[in-house]
From Swiss-Prot:
It comes from Tityus obscurus (Amazonian scorpion). This is Toxin To5. GO terms for molecular function: sodium channel inhibitor activity; toxin activity. Residues 1-19 form the signal peptide. One of its GO terms (cellular component) is extracellular region.
Length: 84
């Protein structure tokens, strides 16, 4: 049992050190990429185009895995969507 807990702890530490950033990517205007149920293929294509490993539609927005540090994600800076 201790070995399993140690193994899970190591996996969590590896994820923390590797710094994989996952989240809702935002456009240049600060808006999230909108999607609808069943458009996982579109979100996956958008996420990989942004440098992520993959993505899916977490309605109403695309969720991306392993985004590079130069991509902004929702919540990492003030929301400016729809503002001039």
């Amino acid at each position: 049992m201790k070995a399993i807990i140690f193994f899970i702890g190591c996996l969590m530490l590896i994820d923390l050190v590797a710094g994989s950033r996952s989240g809702y990517p935002v456009t240049q205007k600060g808006c999230v990429y909108s999607c609808f149920w069943g458009s996982n293929w579109w979100c996956n294509a958008e996420c990989t185009a942004l440098g992520g490993s993959s993505g899916y539609c977490a309605w109403p927005s695309c969720w991306c895995y392993s985004l590079p540090d130069n991509r902004n994600i929702w919540g990492s800076y003030p929301n400016n969507c729809g503002k001039k």
